[in-house]
């Protein structure tokens, strides 16, 4: 044909930037491209640089607000469009065909360059509007592509086929650029904001022209361009082929996304938005761009089939990263603004079925017997909705007006108690008092009117309501069914889900992509759920066609999407997340609400029911896995009233479904476990036996053998899993902020359906009747709302009867509360959520906090106290009672006096009874952490407790005289407060903390005698019964053992002073002897200097019977047992860092004895001297006094000398040691060093010097 004949120069005309807008270039290429000035920029700069003559400018004909540069730009675009081609009037064909110009392809490329140079880089719409004025899309691009499609359909021969295809692709690319949807946002420039409404009208006109020209033949031409690409296998496709397919999908997406501009950009005035004539360009109606027309054109031109093909083949035949997002957005735009019920439920057009009208017949409007044709236009359906709303309001308005006097006016004067008159006009004011006051309230002008913020509906609703006629409903129903049955939905969701999970942060993904993903999931879940509900014959819950939406990946994504949207306050995204969350809950509830039809129970049906229950429980367990997610769900309804009505409706429905689900789970005995993460608190961590941190860490090394468990215990965050308590969780949804949300929602009762009103009533019924939280609804706004709702509802309706019953019960309870509180100021405000306010308003009593037993936070043991000097018993009681009064413990003293009197009475009846104090948990804590109370109890004669489970016990040795005297003194000084001491000193001045270490007077007074020749002293495993820490672990047994061993010599001397053995000693009144060296030696014992000075000195150790038993074992058995003990001891000491228990000391003693007997003389001398000087073991010789005295008089040495002696011992004895030797000597030294640190400063254990490297003195090292 001559229409497409062109020169050879056009055949060879090809540039690399044909699809440069849709091909990703590297950063260097982009910078080079930006640095090069385009011809359009040069011309514009040359035009704007010279100064224009003012007279010439004034005389030039320009449009309003149009510059000379804009006029020249439009002229240049007009020239390019004219050079592109036009109708060939020389042809005999009518209408005349379109003929391309000689440089048509170059003109198309120049126009694209102008768009890139001006519109994209300068953020403007100048070129796009110039193209619209020139009629580029309407008169050129659409005609060119449709004419090419006709020739291809008729299989006509086209010359220069390559150039023609390039021209078609250039036209397609320009169509995509000129129809790209625009959104009003902050990123728009000032010129774009001014031209926003104009460019939106241009897009609407493009949409109409594409859909209406030859019934959308342009779409068929675009699909024909992409057919060769689809026919190729994925391996054979080139990047250019993928870009062509992407262009076609973008064109489909653009047509679906084009909508008329909103009436206003404000978030406060979008209610009931409707398209007016000013929002549409001339010659365009709502039917031209409606979803019905779009679906009809798409079906006719195989567009829906193309979407099904690509969606079902993503990941296999087509790249999911390149095409998945576009397909998902196209599906989302098709279903946006529509509910699943609108697609499923067929509209009822009357009792007589109406046949589809023939295209060749016109309905007879005069014939009354012919049924009315259904309304198929968008304007007609919108008019039907308006008429229905009008009739509803008219019915409500006229139901209380008498028909006889309805046409007459009325004037009513109302006089208040303060003689003020108010005039009300109108017939409705005469009905009753409520109507009169309501009429009076309407005349008030409110200063602060509350508006809804329409800031959360962008991804859920369209700018204008969507009306679906029968044709569109049928097309969409068939498309959705094919989309589900063909597996396209599951494939699309799986591909997009894997793509989203590959992103490290969802905030980096486009917000529209995430919204379209979750909205599509929620819509198809709703569709499948309602389809199953409508199918009364098939009771099987088949969610296989939407199974990909119920996968583990989607639950992770929805929880993350929920959190991110709420944290950054993206209300549009949060609205979509709540809709998806609501659908998942409704699916779970529908499974639990299903009943088995055959009660006898067929096997298949019961097994299917169990499978469905597992599905429902799996949904709930995955949704409620984290505590922070549940907290977000509780917080969302508290502020829902500040957003759009749809957002508020979804929030209320989510709460309603959740409460219903919790009730179902409790009845079905479903157990949910929720995870909570918290930061590890060092202060609140439970200590093992109340030890300090360093000791606890060493014990953990022994308890937890693996490093993995140790790392887990020292993690910064602790994850706990606990069972979800449905009752406590349900109580969180009855917060006063959520109650206010429900009241605000119900206040719009005129716009709510009966089912939505019942939802609100069920919430209030659950709060007021079931939970009996009466004060939560004693609010004036709620009472007024109930009265208005009752008057609004039609008389005799079941809903009004329910409201009246609730009002009757409510006022009955409120009347009782009003009699108790004659001035209920609280009804004016929402109730405070603290327990004190709740209990007081409900019962009239002051709230007392319940005592809870805290096992995680045990009280800290108070330090032991003593008086600064000797006081008599009267002064002692006086000081301690006065100090407890200073601490405001008067009630504690009263209770103690009562307990002492009770104990005295019990002792009179039974003198041998052991009395205990009947204390509460709070008093038990004081027994441990209050040093003054412990001191007082110790003076009385009680055995002090050390844990919350223990109570003070009064032994039978305390006589009645002492007990009665102490009780009278406590009474005396308790009633004589305040007491003035000498020099106005406070009572705590006369009390001080007892010094740590050995107390000789206390030992001589309380401790029983030990035979220092008794060998069992060295291996005593029980702690001192009179010690102030008899509940701690074996580490404290070691400390107590050390004190007992080191004080043998002092006890001998004290016996000589106080009397002979077996004779009772009197209480010592003398002060402690000043022996600072001795006390310091008790805190830190060191190796004497003579061990360093004389290595040849030997001390005989006669404790061999404790090293090995006198049994009949053979040498092999002894060696085997020895090596087992050696390995066991080495492992224990390595794990514990040198800390040994009493059983381990036995093992150490045996090894040391082997060293002494098995080595040479030098080794035996060194071992014997170390055993004697360190003082761990008791010798059998009779010269214990000399040994103890020698150890006491020896001067300590530093740790460096300690290390030197063991190193020298290793060098000298390494060759002489047998296989029975080991590294125990150095371990024992470290044991002593650690114990000395515990004795000296148990609170500062973290400052202990690091351990030295252990010395291995065995034959293994020689090898």
From Swiss-Prot:
GO molecular function terms listed in the Swiss-Prot or TrEMBL record? DNA binding
* Keyword list, A-Z: Cell cycle, DNA damage, DNA repair, DNA replication inhibitor, Meiosis, Nucleus
Q: Which GO terms describe its biological process?
A: DNA damage response; DNA repair; DNA replication checkpoint signaling; meiotic cell cycle; replication fork arrest
Q: What is its main location?
A: nucleus
The answer to keyword ATP-binding applying to this record is no
One Pfam match, given by its short name, reads: TIMELESS
InterPro entries the record matches: Timeless (IPR044998), Timeless_N (IPR006906)
Compositional bias, Acidic residues, is annotated for 1179-1189
Mention any one GO cellular component term assigned to this protein in its UniProt record. replication fork protection complex
Biased segments, Basic residues type: 1060-1071
Compartments annotated for it: namely: Nucleus
Region: Disordered, residue numbers = 1042-1098, 1178-1263
For the keyword Transcription, the answer is no
Polar residues composition bias: which ranges? Answer: 1211-1226
Q: What's the stated role of this polypeptide?
A: Forms a fork protection complex (FPC) with CSM3 and which is required for chromosome segregation during meiosis and DNA damage repair. FPC coordinates leading and lagging strand synthesis and moves with the replication fork. FPC stabilizes replication forks in a configuration that is recognized by replication checkpoint sensors.
- The family this protein is said to belong to: Belongs to the timeless family.
- Tell me how this protein assembles: Component of the fork protection complex (FPC) consisting of TOF1 and CSM3.
What's the protein called, per UniProt?
A: Topoisomerase 1-associated factor 1
This chain's source organism reads: Candida albicans (strain SC5314 / ATCC MYA-2876) (Yeast)
